[in-house]
Amino acid sequence: MYQPDFPTVPFRLGLYPVVDSVAWIERLLEAGVRTIQLRIKDKRDEEVEADVIAAIALGRCYDARLFINDYWRLAIKHNAYGVHLGQEDLETTDLKAIQAAGLRLGVSTHDDMEIDIALAAKPSYIALGHVFPTQTKQMPSAPQGLAQLARHIERLADYPTVAIGGISLERAPAVLATGVGSIAVVSAITQAADWRAATAQLLAIAGVGDE
């Protein structure tokens, strides 16, 4: 059985929005979300440090699981709950420093080979994507679909997992039915006509996660 080397997270992280601003972090924590990621791309550390500090403070205020995407040095410096890394970041990141700081680690994967690479790092959770076509970011691979997602879940057994990529309110129940621990969403909330209603409906489906 695979086991994380990094600090553990609940198998069910619940609804897991991925957003690009502190304003969204605050809105969603106020709305009841308890697992969330700040993903700001392609800026220097000094440009995003204030946002990272503010996001981490909000996470603490709401006793939430706040992951910082990519900016691992800032996450360590300001003691975030966790860090999320893409495959391309694994080789250039000091994983031992993240581990020594006591931060949780999530890693993105897109196929079996990348799952193997992620498992070698023994992160706190493994993200599996993209499940469906997505407009949120350019993807180098084809969508996995539900059947492939289910196969990955079967392989990983009790390892905490997060499904991501094109997951809408309508698709969320079928994604969770694969046995995946959590669902990450982006546009299902941020581009919804009524983000509060969308968040409430997704929370009703996915929950807030286990303690």
UniProtKB/Swiss-Prot annotation:
Mg(2+) binds at residues 70, 89. Keywords: Magnesium, Metal-binding, Thiamine biosynthesis, Transferase. GO terms for cellular component: cytoplasm. InterPro entries: Aldolase_TIM, ThiamineP_synth_sf, ThiamineP_synth_TenI, TMP_synthase. Pathway: Cofactor biosynthesis; thiamine diphosphate biosynthesis; thiamine phosphate from 4-amino-2-methyl-5-diphosphomethylpyrimidine and 4-methyl-5-(2-phosphoethyl)-thiazole: step 1/1. 2-[(2R,5Z)-2-carboxy-4-methylthiazol-5(2H)-ylidene]ethyl phosphate binds at residues 134-136, 166, 186-187. It comes from the Bacteria. SUPFAM superfamilies: Thiamin phosphate synthase (SSF51391). 4-amino-2-methyl-5-(diphosphooxymethyl)pyrimidine binds at residues 37-41, 69, 108, 137. This is Thiamine-phosphate synthase. It comes from Salmonella typhi. The gene is thiE.
